């Protein structure tokens, strides 16, 4: 495991260097005390992972994510409705390749009367109870904001329960305008325009996340292979023992 941590740390340092060379602004790059969190761009082949993550949320976390008491059927229907071609969905995986936190950036395109396009986005996030307090929501929000800038979205809308203080704090810190309506609060953030630096940053962060995931996947497969070898050895030893008797 020490070797794996060394490989991941080396990969992180190289990615930091590439981000600096690309001139990525500080608001898109963690400071020296932060961990560069690998955030994967989820695809259709991750549907089972997404559903497993959402179903593992407790009742309170489901309430914070969806704004209502969602049962398993609601979650299943939500997962089926995901549009991977239109929207962007991100996930943070642990070493067992299970999603700890995920974000959904829904992209909306509206055609104005003058035939121009107006692009907006809506942000939703969920975090498993175990890693809470590690800043994963903030990291996911930064990643979503990066893509929203590159996708030429003008605004990001966040619907959050008024009791969801951490999410509202992140939105307020980013400069969003908050409007409370009873138990819900709507946060509207004007998105700065993207540029070459943000586009390069998105390419590098995606590559870092993909490489990190591949390392974790290889390690998991390697340990599974070792377990299989151990099982075979036990079977051979047991067979020899029976033959000797």
Locate each region found by the language model.
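Terminal substrate-recognition subdomain of acyl/acetyltransferases
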Residues: 1-37, 160, 166-245
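Basic nucleic-acid-binding interfaces
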Residues: 108, 137, 176, 180
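A short gly/proline-enriched turn/hairpin at secondary-structure junctions
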Residues: 61-67
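Conserved acetyl-CoA-binding loop-helix of GNAT-fold acetyltransferases
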Residues: 127, 133-148, 155, 169-173
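A short beta-loop-alpha structural element at the N-terminal edge
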Residues: 37-52
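Acetyl-CoA-dependent GNAT
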Residues: 67-118, 124, 128
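A short, internal acetyl-CoA/4′-phosphopantetheine-binding micro-motif in the GNAT/acyltransferase core
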Residues: 122-133, 161
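Structured alpha-helical
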Residues: 98-100, 151, 170
